[in-house]
Curated annotation (Swiss-Prot):
<keyword id="KW-0378">Hydrolase</keyword>
<dbReference type="GO" id="GO:0035578">
    <property type="term" value="C:azurophil granule lumen"/>
</dbReference>
<dbReference type="InterPro" id="IPR014033">
    <property type="entry name" value="Arginase"/>
</dbReference>
<dbReference type="GO" id="GO:0006527">
    <property type="term" value="P:arginine catabolic process"/>
</dbReference>
<dbReference type="GO" id="GO:0005576">
    <property type="term" value="C:extracellular region"/>
</dbReference>
<keyword id="KW-0963">Cytoplasm</keyword>
<keyword id="KW-0479">Metal-binding</keyword>
<keyword id="KW-0056">Arginine metabolism</keyword>
<dbReference type="Pfam" id="PF00491">
    <property type="entry name" value="Arginase"/>
</dbReference>
<feature type="modified residue" description="Phosphoserine">
    <location>
        <position position="217"/>
    </location>
</feature>
<comment type="subunit">
    <text>Homotrimer. Interacts with CMTM6.</text>
</comment>
<feature type="binding site">
    <location>
        <begin position="126"/>
        <end position="130"/>
    </location>
    <ligand>
        <name>substrate</name>
    </ligand>
</feature>
<comment type="function">
    <text>Key element of the urea cycle converting L-arginine to urea and L-ornithine, which is further metabolized into metabolites proline and polyamides that drive collagen synthesis and bioenergetic pathways critical for cell proliferation, respectively; the urea cycle takes place primarily in the liver and, to a lesser extent, in the kidneys.</text>
</comment>
<dbReference type="GO" id="GO:0000050">
    <property type="term" value="P:urea cycle"/>
</dbReference>
<comment type="pathway">
    <text>Nitrogen metabolism; urea cycle; L-ornithine and urea from L-arginine: step 1/1.</text>
</comment>
<feature type="binding site">
    <location>
        <position position="232"/>
    </location>
    <ligand>
        <name>Mn(2+) 2</name>
    </ligand>
</feature>
<dbReference type="GO" id="GO:0045087">
    <property type="term" value="P:innate immune response"/>
</dbReference>
Length: 322
């Protein structure tokens, strides 16, 4: 694989206001403390750390209808979009360490500024495609995709803090994997727009090999293009990632998570990656936190070439005789 698929720019995004539970802003810290950067370097990656974004507190951030913390969420994603665009212009794969999944508005927007033809693979128990009008919780981490989709332009009210957002992907540019907790309004949007998805039912029926074959053929079949993988750790079963805000039983296994990421790496087209919703405050025990963090690290390493079959550099003296 080319050196390009191992050239990474890391952005920490310690932000939690897209959802109600404290602790997810510690995600970047615990992923770094687990040795993520060192491990990436050990597997021959060229890693540049852009540090953690400084998110200022926005006072008087009153709700918009029932949408909570709109200005804080909008501003955080605006900052992240600028930083991701910078990383992409520097020729690196952007690796965003979240933080809650509302940040994908910024991550994908920034990526699309440099690569407008990107395709998105969204691994999650949830579709995160509620609009500010269909949401029942008001939490923006359940709404990022609705802000990004061109087909929903005109269906999204003018939420304070979001005037900078321009929808940048079409319904045909995204594939979901791992769905198992989808609101009725979200299901209506999926079906109406004809969005490609593999719920856990499809994963069970087809197997993860077929799911990835179909996903990559759907996104890359007509033309090779950059891939943005937005990975919510709650896409995996809570037995592997318990320390997260909205766990749902019956998720992807550790092995299925690794298979998804190994296959994406093998395309050589991974261009942006989000690792979202690791919340160390929500582990019932220290071991649950460690398990969640270690799983998130393993998923990340597989995105950049770590293979379960093993890896090696050229070993000249073992070359077969001519």
């Amino acid at each position: 694989m080319s050196a390009k698929s191992r050239t990474i720019g890391i952005i920490g995004a310690p932000f939690s206001k897209g959802q109600p539970r404290g602790g997810v802003e510690e995600g970047p810290t615990v992923l770094r403390k687990a040795g993520l950067l060192e491990k990436l370097k050990e597997q021959e990656c060229d890693v540049k750390d852009y540090g953690d974004l400084p998110f200022a507190d926005i006072p008087n951030d009153s709700p918009f209808q029932i949408v909570k913390n709109p200005r804080s969420v909008g501003k955080a994603s605006e900052q992240l979009a600028g930083k991701v665009a910078e990383v992409k212009k520097n020729g690196r794969i952007s690796l965003v360490l979240g933080g809650d999944h509302s940040l994908a508005i910024g991550s994908i927007s920034g990526h699309a500024r440099v690569h407008p033809d990107l395709g998105v693979i969204w691994v999650d128990a949830h579709t995160d495609i509620n609009t500010p009008l269909t949401t029942t919780s008001g939490n923006l981490h359940g709404q990022p995709v609705s802000f990004l989709l061109k087909e929903l332009k005109g269906k999204i009210p003018d939420v304070p803090g979001f005037s900078w957002v321009t929808p940048c992907i079409s319904a045909k540019d995204i594939v979901y994997i791992g769905l198992r907790d989808v609101d009725p309004g979200e299901h209506y949007i999926l079906k109406t727009l004809g969005i490609k998805y593999f719920s856990m039912t499809e994963v069970d029926r087809l197997g993860i090999g077929k799911v990835m074959e179909e996903t990559l053929s759907y996104l890359l079949g007509r033309k090779k293009r950059p891939i943005h993988l937005s990975f919510d750790v709650d896409g995996l079963d809570p037995s592997f990632t318990p320390a997260t805000g909205t766990p749902v039983v019956g998720g992807l296994t550790y092995r299925e998570g690794l298979y998804i990421t190994e296959e994406i790496y093998k395309t050589g087209l991974l261009s942006g990656l989000d690792i979202m919703e690791v919340n160390p405050s929500l582990g019932k025990t220290p071991e649950e936190v460690t398990r969640t963090v270690n799983t998130a690290v393993a998923i990340t390493l597989a995105c950049f070439g770590l293979a379960r079959e093993g890896n090696h550099k050229p070993i000249d003296y073992l070359n077969p005789p001519k």
